[in-house]
Amino acid sequence: MSNKGQTLQDPFLNTLRKEHVPVSIYLVNGIKLQGQIESFDQYVVLLRNTVTQMVYKHAISTVVPARAVSFQVEVPAE
């Protein structure tokens, strides 16, 4: 994945994780998962509800927070 993609994903997912924002995650096959983001890395997101699920990022279509969130994106120096 390009560095630019990471500069958007990481702050967004980290804000959702730190603020315990409930999210709906839609997979590319249409399945909707709900919970809170427990952790994430380059390839997976750990989603906690009654159990913790490991969701591969390549299977995720959309992440929808239950409320509006604001986050800072650091622009890398070129």
UniProtKB/Swiss-Prot annotation:
- Which Pfam families does the UniProt entry name for this protein? Hfq
Any idea where the Sm domain is?
10-69
The record's Gene Ontology cellular component field reads: cytosol
Lineage, top-rank taxon, reads Bacteria
Report keywords, A-Z.
Answer: RNA-binding, Stress response
Q: Which SUPFAM superfamilies match?
A: Sm-like ribonucleoproteins (SSF50182)
HAMAP family, per the entry? Hfq (MF_00436)
Query: Which PANTHER family does the UniProt entry name for this protein?
Result: RNA-BINDING PROTEIN HFQ
Q: NCBIfam families from the entry?
A: Hfq (TIGR02383), PRK00395.1 (NF001602)
Q: Please describe what this protein does.
A: RNA chaperone that binds small regulatory RNA (sRNAs) and mRNAs to facilitate mRNA translational regulation in response to envelope stress, environmental stress and changes in metabolite concentrations. Also binds with high specificity to tRNAs.
Protein name (database record): RNA-binding protein Hfq
- Native organism is Bordetella avium (strain 197N)
